Amino acid sequence: MTKESSVLNHKASGTALVICAPSGTGKTTLIQRLRKEFPCFAYSISCTTRPPRKNEEDGKDYYFISQEEFIARKNEKYFAEWAYVHGYFYGTPLAPILTILNNGQDILFDIDVQGAAQLYLTLPYAKYIFLLPPTMVELEKRLRSRGTDREDIIQHRLLSATQEIRQAHWFDTWIVNENIDKAYDELRATYLASKLSPKFQPTLITSILEGW
């Protein structure tokens, strides 16, 4: 889909920030800090077929639905993107995204690489950010330090991380999370800079020249 054929109203579009990262990179921590500093962010709530984790709430963290319901919605073109990850389906509803952006509000997406590639077809002008570990050795160390996953799951996550990193070449921005504070400063700066882009200020020039 081209920018010209997008379903969004370019006269009043918020900033869309898409953040992807392999498991263990620190994405959740960085996103939480960004949302705390910028509470104006709308957050894209995904649907998933996986069971809720401890302290997760339906309608707040995810919409937890059955596989049958997910497939039915997918066939109805309900999702802007969807993916099958680690044995479960994940998908981002399209309608709320369009409403949020057309109202001029900023929105944050926390999705995987498969989903980001699909979302690009609908939102090519979003800012796509990929978070990287400093090394694969460090990523393995972080995954093991959690103490929650079996060895086979750790190995699967490392394999997935390798595949995801190899697909990161098309993203707009890479941020290496070696130091959490430095990585956050870079993420914050990327967000603020994206708001200055002409593609998110389509009426600025017209308003400046109006009446001249």
Swiss-Prot record:
E.C. designation(s): 2.7.4.8
Keywords: ATP-binding, Cytoplasm, Kinase, Nucleotide-binding, Transferase
Main location, first listed in the record: cytoplasm
Entry annotated with the keyword ATP-binding: yes
Localization terms from the record: Cytoplasm
Signal peptide location: none
UniProt-listed Pfam families: Guanylate_kin (PF00625)
InterPro entries: GK/Ca_channel_bsu, Guanylate_kin-like_dom, Guanylate_kinase, Guanylate_kinase_CS, P-loop_NTPase
Positions of ATP binding: A21, P22, S23, G24, T25, G26, K27, T28
Cellular component terms (Gene Ontology): cytosol
PROSITE patterns the UniProt entry points to: GUANYLATE_KINASE_1, GUANYLATE_KINASE_2
Annotated Guanylate kinase-like domain residues: 14-192
GO MF: ATP binding; guanylate kinase activity
Family stated for the protein in its record: Belongs to the guanylate kinase family.
Functional note: Essential for recycling GMP and indirectly, cGMP.
Xref: PANTHER family: GUANYLATE KINASE, GUANYLATE KINASE-RELATED
Protein name: Guanylate kinase
UniProt gene name: gmk
